[in-house]
């Protein structure tokens, strides 16, 4: 592992050094070696994809740490750093989840974020799927997003609920392929339900973003 660490961690260590933060960098390096240890020693030699994913992980973390003002750099709490690294090693290949872990790790180095960090965040991230992560990012960027229900109302009276929750994370030009995940109503509904269960979003069917109306299909 020792011969692989310099390649993977040099950029991060260099960034921290320019901020006069050798101690936090050393803490991270030692934590990485302790957590990933023999697992990566084997996988990095046998799997080029694993090496690539690790490098992208550190690259993302480095970019985020570079944005932290020098005066805000702090020694990360091991109670955040350790569990986050431990959990993330099983999600390295999932880019969307990996990005969230990188953001959490970067925040642990930022004193201005200390009051916002909570130890439960690691467990919450572990319960996210890649689709959950993409949908959460989509919603966070827009603050409010529309959801809908599909109901059939019969002329004779009565209703039939076709879809209890419809969420389409669409922005820009609609893609022609109906295989795109944005049109997978059931998966997106399950994703939104999970995000609400975790307390990350709130689904509200009582507030309308536009005028309430019914669409009649003949």
Task: Give the residues covered by each predicted segment.
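Charged, alpha-helical interface segments at or near domain boundaries
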Residues: 5, 9-131, 138
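Generic preference for hydrophobic/aromatic residues in regular secondary structure cores
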Residues: 8-9, 13-16, 145-154, 201
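Hydrophobic/aromatic-lined pockets within catalytic cores
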Residues: 36, 40, 140, 144, ...
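Arginine residue identity/basic-tract feature
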Residues: 45, 50, 98, 134, ...
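Short amphipathic alpha-helical interface segments
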Residues: 116-180
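Short amphipathic alpha-helical interaction segments
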Residues: 178-210
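Short, amphipathic alpha-helical interaction segments positioned at domain boundaries
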Residues: 211-218
């Amino acid at each position: 592992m020792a011969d692989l660490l310099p390649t993977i961690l040099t950029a991060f260590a260099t960034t921290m050094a320019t901020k006069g933060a050798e101690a936090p960098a050393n803490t991270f390096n030692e934590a990485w070696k302790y957590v990933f240890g023999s697992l990566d020693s084997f996988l990095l030699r046998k799997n080029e994809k694993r090496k690539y994913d690790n490098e992208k992980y550190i690259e993302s973390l480095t970019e985020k740490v570079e944005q932290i003002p020098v005066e805000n750099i702090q020694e990360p709490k091991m109670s955040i750093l350790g569990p986050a690294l431990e959990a993330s090693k099983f999600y390295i290949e999932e880019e969307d989840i990996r990005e969230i872990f990188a953001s959490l790790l970067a925040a642990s180095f930022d004193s201005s974020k200390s009051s916002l960090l909570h130890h439960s965040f690691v467990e919450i991230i572990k319960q996210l799927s890649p689709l959950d992560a993409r949908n959460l990012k989509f919603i966070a960027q827009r603050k409010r997003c529309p959801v809908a229900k599909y109901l059939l109302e019969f002329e004779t009276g009565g209703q039939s609920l076709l879809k209890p929750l419809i969420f389409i994370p669409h922005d820009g030009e609609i893609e022609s392929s109906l295989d795109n995940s944005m049109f997978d109503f059931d998966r997106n509904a399950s994703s939104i339900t999970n995000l609400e269960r975790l307390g990350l979003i709130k689904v509200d069917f009582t507030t309308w973003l536009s005028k309430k109306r019914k669409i009649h299909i003949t």
